[in-house]
């Protein structure tokens, strides 16, 4: 992974074979990122995406093992119990089909190019139990 900062903005390049959420969590820890939003594009070989089921109180996940483009990646990083918590959603496409949802795992196949913006003047954290801790501002 590579990171190139300019002010509160960073170009993050996640490399082939890296797991996206783990890489972003490590990046946040190493760069003291406590509050940020990000978006990006790239390609993957494997994803595990889901949707939150309100009645069950958890996510229902499906795993896909195929080469897909990241048509859209968006998310945020906020602290939960003092550690970076990455929350990401994605839209993935391959051979005329698209799928997406809440990202649980995402293995990069070539590169993932992310624009991340730190929120310098707003203190945001996550409070509550996993899998869906709520945002708390202030």
Residue ranges of model-derived segments:
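N-terminal intrinsically disordered, cationic/polar leader segments
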Residues: 1-86, 91-138
């Amino acid at each position: 992974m590579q990171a190139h900062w300019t002010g509160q903005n960073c170009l993050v390049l996640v490399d082939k074979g890296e797991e996206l959420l783990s890489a972003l969590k490590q990046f946040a820890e190493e760069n003291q990122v406590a509050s940020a939003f990000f978006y990006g594009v790239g390609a993957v070989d494997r994803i595990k995406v889901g949707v939150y089921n309100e009645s069950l109180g958890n996510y229902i996940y499906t795993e896909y093992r195929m080469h897909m483009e990241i048509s859209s990646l968006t998310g945020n990083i906020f602290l939960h119990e003092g550690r970076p918590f990455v929350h990401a959603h994605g839209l993935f496409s391959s051979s005329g089909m698209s799928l997406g949802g809440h990202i649980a795992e995402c293995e990069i196949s070539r590169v993932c190019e992310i624009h991340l913006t730190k929120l310098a003047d707003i203190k945001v954290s996550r409070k509550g139990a996993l899998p869906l801790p709520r945002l708390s501002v202030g």
